[in-house]
Amino acid sequence: ERVVQRRVDLLASDGVTFKTSTEIGRDVSAKQLMDDFDAVVLCVGATKPNDFFAKTAGRDLTGIHFAMEFLTKNTKSLLDSRHEDGQYIDAAGKDVIVIGGGDTGTDCIGTSLRHGCNSLVTFEIVPQSPNERAPNNPWPQWPRIMRVDYGHQEAAAKFDYSRVKGKQLS
């Protein structure tokens, strides 16, 4: 919390204005934002899941969880009781599949590994990124390239993916 507040304070001292818990269209209009600021960055968060598989057979089976439910319960239980309260979704000894990527998917991978999952597979719905920047992705744009994040590195080390032919970390 202290680290995040320090960064917020640094950005604010550089002239960044933060408007939190604000619904565009209810609390402020998009036009007003565009009129009042040179640049607008919308950080909407990901706490409400998009259930892509709502109509898939078996979606309601026990053991299927949304990422933020898994991560939030884990963090709260860890901070409150070092997991002694049992109020978290335990991946220990389980065969885990993480569907989705980005920071949230990587955090789910890392958390599952730290719990001691039996196995772990991760899927993303986007094609694999190239190893090098494409001509239509020049600097200073964010590089859309293949990365191996900390969770993938931990999974590769634990399960020795380097020895499994055809396995690919993404």
Question: What are the language-model segments listed below?
Answer:
Residues E1-S170:
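Residues forming the flavin
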